[in-house]
Amino acid sequence: ASRRHEFEFQISDYKWTYHTRIDYCLKDLVGQLEQLKKHAPNHTQVLCLGHKNNFRYAIYPRYKSNRRGIRKAAGYGALREWLANNYESVILPNVEADDALGLMAGPDDLIYSKDKDLRTIKGVHMESNGELTEVTELEANRNFYKQVLTGDSCDGYPGCPNVGVNAKFFDSDDWLKCYTEIDFWQLVQGQYLLATKKLFDRHQVTDPLKFALQMARVARILRPGEYDHENDKPVLWDGPS
């Protein structure tokens, strides 16, 4: 919203700056939230906001490195503060908004996010038009392990070489016959081992299985029980048991 209503402004012959119409932004945001409320009148809205610190940077230092140096829109901080003060909201130390949502999502909740990564969380997901889609545990797991393989160029982590989003591998019997997390994880590890040479050539990776775990921890949207509230930190994913 802040980017949509940001304008260049000339303050002198040689000086330009940016300004944002916060009132326009608030109108947009409140309108969107009210529309969502109409779609789910029997639910209480809880906004999940990201914390300033992010545990993923310690796991993979190049995480979101492609976004560093990109200026946030003018007024972004003020809008965020206004939302936190005027709506029921949750911020958990050291994790992103997606993680807070994934941790809180229960069987009676509706999940709303435009981020495809949330499809790794089981539950009922709502679209902006009110349409509801249920993501089963199997679908959530399949989406997660697929993300571990494909990586995410927007978030700056590479995944496994030659396994893109549209790779034929995801239509193979090996993939489609996976039902347990152990099945998925063993198959994912196998793909990373097959890519040993390319991983070294492209990323100087000497331990493909360690790198696979690194990618999984970065890709993992935290689920219920995967956060240590006493110490304000996530419980790092360590593979299926």
Where are these regions (language model features)?
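Non-catalytic, usually N-terminal nucleic-acid engagement modules in DNA/RNA processing proteins
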Residues: 1-44, 50, 57
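Extended two-metal-dependent nuclease catalytic cores across DNA- and RNA-processing enzymes
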Residues: 12-16, 24, 40-43, 65-240
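A short beta-strand-to-loop transition that corresponds to the Sensor-1 phosphate-sensing loop
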Residues: 48-52, 113-116
